[in-house]
A protein has these predicted regions:
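The feature represents the first ordered module of a protein
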Residues: 1-57
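Low-complexity, compositionally biased segments
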Residues: 15, 25, 81, 111-112
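Amphipathic protein-protein interaction modules
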Residues: 45-93
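Long, highly charged low-complexity segments enriched in Glu/Asp and Lys/Arg with interspersed Ser/Thr
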Residues: 92-112
């Protein structure tokens, strides 16, 4: 994965904890984001298609969502670029994941 895709993967992995601890809250948060974002994007744009796909995933349940959050499959990578989970992690959690990711990337990609 490219750096930004790997960073997104790490952030989405961090969502597994909240998702498994309180799935109703996390899925409701994602649904609220989707509703809000639908009005902010062109009705005929690609973002609407991604949001519709996320809605279907949310309707499929926690297991389907968790699978996409951690998958390296190209389609999952693309889905995460339009993730409805903004705001689930608080700023301290996000920053901690970013710091951990930077250390990981520097260590594992030092020769690249």
């Amino acid at each position: 994965l490219r750096r930004e895709e790997e960073r997104s993967l790490w952030l989405h992995r961090a969502l597994l904890g909240p998702l498994l601890r309180d799935p109703d809250k996390v899925l409701a948060h994602a649904r609220a984001n989707i509703i809000r974002w639908r009005g902010a994007h062109r009705p005929d744009g690609m973002t609407q298609a991604w949001l519709s796909e996320w809605e279907a995933l949310l309707d499929s349940g926690v297991d389907a969502v968790a699978e996409v959050l951690v998958s390296r499959a190209p389609h999952a990578v693309d889905l995460r670029t339009n993730s409805p989970f903004a705001g689930v992690l608080d700023e301290n959690e996000r920053q901690a994941v970013h710091r951990s990711f930077r250390r990981h990337w520097a260590r594992d990609h030092a020769d690249a």
